[in-house]
């Protein structure tokens, strides 16, 4: 049972809803909202307290794309944490291809850099006890019906992964939507490598699926945002079936991922092949690169090239 849980990006969307659901579990004693913006975090905390009737929410302010910010935040964590949900991230927006001081582009830094530092620093301090869940995505195995091709790297070498992280893999024209799947692949493979390094801690990668009510469309180009918000999500996806679900359902995947023994360490769970909703299943049954331990370790080594 997880008595204390930290959630990154917990002031909105799936992260906030996961915090609400976790607070209502009888074993939960503390939920830490790990957020970038103080005022938004305070507003989320107030709303969560009102909705749950619980006074168990705490706030830690840090920017997951900034290594030093995360390291400073770790120093403020005095008591062990049972579980962490690495939820912050997404497509990011217009600045996605910009290079950060770490050498990673903004997209990679936001989805990977701070999360790796947070987890590894807490383990080093013996402050992480039971479980880590990473928000991954169906963009990794792809969704044929929507024209989303699976991530396909030549040899998944350290250099290839590093090129994804600094953006050079994509050449002169960096498209965040295309790069997103590759960044999530790198993050997911790091998680699977961690499962082998630390067998006493559960490491699960989990896609929330295609979830309504999140801030995800906000970072898309205007035309795509309009199409997704007003046409695809409310009309097309429900007609197709197995392609969209509510915020509560998406967040429950995360809650179950850290709490339910059905979900095993070292596995990436997401929707069934070709779907974006429904049961969360082991993706390695059809996207077999996930099983390659050399690829997993290559992702880990590539990420650590950018961590000083």
Please name every model-derived segment:
Residues 1-214, 308:
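Rossmann-fold NAD(P)H-dependent dehydrogenase/reductase core
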Residues 115, 184-187, 247, 296, ...:
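A structural signal for well-ordered alpha-helical scaffolds and beta->alpha junctions
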Residues 170-177, 210-212, 216-248:
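Alpha-helical membrane-targeting segments
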Residues 290-308:
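Amphipathic terminal alpha-helices
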Residues 66, 259-260, 283-296:
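Polar helix-capping/helix-linker motif
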Residues 197, 205-220, 267-288:
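C-terminal/domain-terminus segments
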Residues 40-43, 106, 249, 256, ...:
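Residues within well-formed alpha-helices
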Residues 232-286, 301, 305:
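C-terminal helical subdomain
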């Amino acid at each position: 049972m997880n008595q204390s849980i930290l959630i990154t990006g917990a002031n909105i969307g799936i992260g906030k809803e996961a915090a609400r659901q976790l607070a209502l579990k009888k074993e939960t004693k503390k939920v830490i909202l790990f957020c970038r913006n103080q005022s938004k975090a305070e507003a989320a905390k107030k709303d969560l307290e009102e909705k749950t009737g619980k006074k168990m929410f705490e706030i830690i302010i840090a920017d997951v794309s900034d290594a030093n910010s995360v390291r400073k935040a770790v120093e403020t964590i005095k008591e062990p944490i049972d579980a962490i949900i690495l939820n912050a991230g997404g497509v990011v927006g217009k600045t996605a291809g910009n290079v950060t001081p770490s050498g990673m582009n903004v997209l990679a830094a936001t989805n990977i850099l701070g999360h790796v530092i947070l987890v590894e620093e807490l383990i080093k301090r013996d402050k992480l006890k039971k479980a880590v869940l990473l928000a991954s995505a169906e963009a990794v195995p792809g969704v044929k019906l929507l024209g989303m091709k699976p991530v396909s790297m030549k040899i998944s070498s350290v250099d290839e992964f590093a090129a994804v992280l600094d953006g050079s893999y994509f050449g002169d024209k960096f498209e965040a939507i295309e790069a997103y799947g590759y960044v999530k692949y790198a993050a997911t493979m790091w998680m699977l490598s961690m499962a082998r390094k630390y067998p006493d801690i559960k490491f699960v990668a989990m896609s929330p699926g295609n979830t309504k009510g999140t801030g995800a469309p906000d970072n898309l180009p205007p035309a795509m945002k309009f199409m997704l918000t007003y046409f695809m999500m409310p009309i097309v996806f429900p007609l197709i079936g197995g392609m969209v679900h509510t915020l509560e359902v998406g967040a429950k995947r995360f809650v179950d991922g850290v709490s339910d023994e059905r979900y095993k360490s070292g596995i990436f769970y997401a929707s069934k092949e070709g779907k974006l909703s429904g049961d969360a299943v082991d993706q390695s049954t059809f996207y077999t690169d996930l099983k390659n331990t050399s690829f997993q370790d290559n992702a880990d080594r590539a990420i650590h090239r950018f961590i000083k």
